[in-house]
Regions:
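An N-terminal assembly and electron-transfer interface module characteristic of large anaerobic redox
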Residues: 1-235
Length: 235
C-alpha cells in the first residue's frame, strides 16, 4: 500500500499501524489531517511538515480495507483551543450520527487532553532543567540532542542518547531548551514548529557561550526539508 519508496520511515510505519488496527477489528480509525501544530511563538508560522499534515490523505487512498470501517481523516486544528471542541463535535457527529456523546462530553475530553499535553511539556522542560543543573554542578559536558519527535523512538534513534551518556556527557532534548529563547531572525523562512525548536535550541547553545555545551542534530530518512534546517542550525 506504500505508494512511494521515497516516503520517510515514519510515514511507511503508518501503513503497517493502520493495517494492524484493522486486523484487530476496530470500528473506527482516527487519523486526522493537521496543517498546523501548536504555536510556540518561535517562528513566522507553525505548520506541520507536509507528511505529518496530510499523510492521512495517502492512507485513505491506498489502504482498501479502510473502505469497510469508519476512517476519521478530517482536517483539525489543535492550535485553535477555543474552537477545537466544537469542530471535533461536528466531525464525530458526522461520522457517528447515532452516538450518545454530547458537546459537553467532547469539551470535557478536549480540556483533559490539552491539560495532559501542557503537563507533559512542563515535565520535559523541568527534567531538562534538572539535568542542566546536574551538568553544571558536576562539570559535565552537555549535548543538546536535537531532532524530530520520532527520534525519541528507540527503533529510530538506536540508543544514541545512551551512547553519548556512556561517553560522560549529559543529554537533553531540543524541546527542553528551545523554550528558553524568544523569537529571533533566521536566514530561512521559519514556518514549521519542529524546525523552530531546532533553531531555538541551536541559539540556546550559542548563547550559553560554553564550550562544554554542544548540539547534535539527528537527521534521518533523507527528509527534504532537513537540507534547509541543517544549514540554518549550523549557521
Amino acid at each position: 500500500t506504500i505508494p512511494s519508496d521515497t516516503a520517510c520511515f515514519p510515514a511507511k510505519l503508518m501503513h503497517g499501524h493502520v493495517e494492524a488496527l484493522l486486523d484487530e477489528g476496530v470500528d473506527a480509525v482516527f487519523y486526522p489531517c493537521m496543517t498546523y501544530n501548536f504555536d510556540e511563538n518561535l517562528g513566522d508560522n507553525h505548520y506541520n511538515c507536509p507528511v505529518v499534515a496530510y499523510y492521512p490523505e495517502v492512507i485513505s487512498s491506498n489502504i482498501q480495507k479502510l473502505k469497510d470501517t469508519v476512517f476519521i481523516g478530517d482536517y483539525v486544528g489543535l492550535h485553535r483551543r477555543h474552537d477545537f471542541p466544537g469542530k471535533m463535535y461536528e466531525i464525530l457527529r458526522r461520522h457517528f450520527p447515532n452516538g450518545t456523546f454530547t458537546k459537553k462530553d467532547v469539551k470535557k475530553a478536549s480540556d483533559a487532553a490539552y491539560a495532559e499535553y501542557d503537563l507533559y511539556m512542563r515535565a520535559v522542560r523541568a527534567i531538562g532543567d534538572k539535568f542542566l543543573a546536574l551538568a553544571e554542578e558536576q562539570h559535565k559536558p552537555v549535548i543538546v540532542l536535537a531532532g524530530r519527535p520520532y527520534h525519541v523512538d528507540p527503533e529510530i534513534n538506536h540508543g544514541i542518547d545512551s551512547l553519548i551518556c556512556d561517553c560522560g556527557a549529559v543529554v537533553v532534548t531540543e524541546d527542553a531548551v528551545a523554550c528558553k529563547e524568544k523569537k529571533f531572525p533566521t536566514k530561512v523562512l521559519n514556518q514549521w514548529t519542529y524546525h523552530s525548536r531546532l533553531y531555538a535550541a541551536a541559539k540556546y547553545v550559542v548563547d550559553r557561550a560554553d564550550k562544554r555545551v554542544n548540539l547534535i542534530q539527528l537527521v534521518s530518512f533523507g527528509c527534504g526539508v532537513d537540507a534547509i534546517t541543517t544549514d540554518e542550525v549550523r549557521g
